[in-house]
């Protein structure tokens, strides 16, 4: 089930920088799989997030992009990321189809968990080999085309977005 999509405004002053994919299961059950081959990093303080660098954007080969996968921990921050990617992992090559972890409901605040889902973003490179800030919509691309999700949000503004 697709929840919020790229560029949704679900609270004042905020535009959603990715796609939320809900599974309808409990936290720690639904696998999260790498969509493309690339170089995985998990920062030392990331409990629920990995990012994969794609040296060649599959939709525009002359640029590098980063795919950001998050909410892979329970509401208290206990990670569901695969043990092969411990905190502090940098630039580990992964194939498409690699198990990254499992969907969770971690929000960063144990008193306010989110629903169990995967948030996935496609983030711009800064031109010097570093990822831009994923929280700023202008630093991201609409992820829909990268994952074969031709969502109908802009054509049907009065209905719930669904895949065509």
Can you say where each PLM-predicted feature lies in the sequence?
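Surface-exposed, glycine-biased beta-strand/turn segments
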Residues: 1-49, 55-57, 96, 105, ...
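Small beta-barrel nucleic-acid-binding modules, principally OB-folds
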Residues: 11-25, 56-70, 82-84, 124-134, ...
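Acidic, glycine-rich catalytic/binding loops that coordinate metals and/or anionic ligands
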Residues: 63-65, 84-98, 113-164
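Short Gly/Pro-enriched loop/turn and capping motifs at secondary-structure junctions
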Residues: 75, 106-108, 125-128
């Amino acid at each position: 089930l697709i929840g919020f999509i790229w560029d949704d405004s679900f609270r004042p002053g905020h535009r959603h920088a990715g796609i939320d994919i809900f599974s309808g299961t409990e936290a720690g059950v639904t696998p999260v799989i790498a969509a493309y081959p690339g170089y995985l990093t998990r920062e030392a303080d990331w409990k629920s997030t990995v990012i994969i660098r794609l040296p060649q954007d599959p939709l525009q080969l002359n640029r590098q992009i980063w795919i950001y996968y998050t909410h892979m921990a329970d509401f208290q921050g206990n990670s569901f990321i695969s043990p092969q990617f411990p905190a502090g992992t940098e630039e580990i090559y992964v194939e498409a189809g690699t198990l990254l972890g499992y969907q969770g409901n971690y929000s960063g605040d144990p008193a306010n968990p989110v629903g169990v889902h995967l948030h996935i973003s496609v983030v711009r490179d800064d031109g010097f080999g570093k990822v831009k800030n994923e929280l700023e919509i202008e630093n991201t691309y609409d992820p829909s085309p990268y994952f074969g999700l031709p969502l109908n949000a802009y054509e049907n503004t009065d209905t719930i977005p669904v895949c065509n």
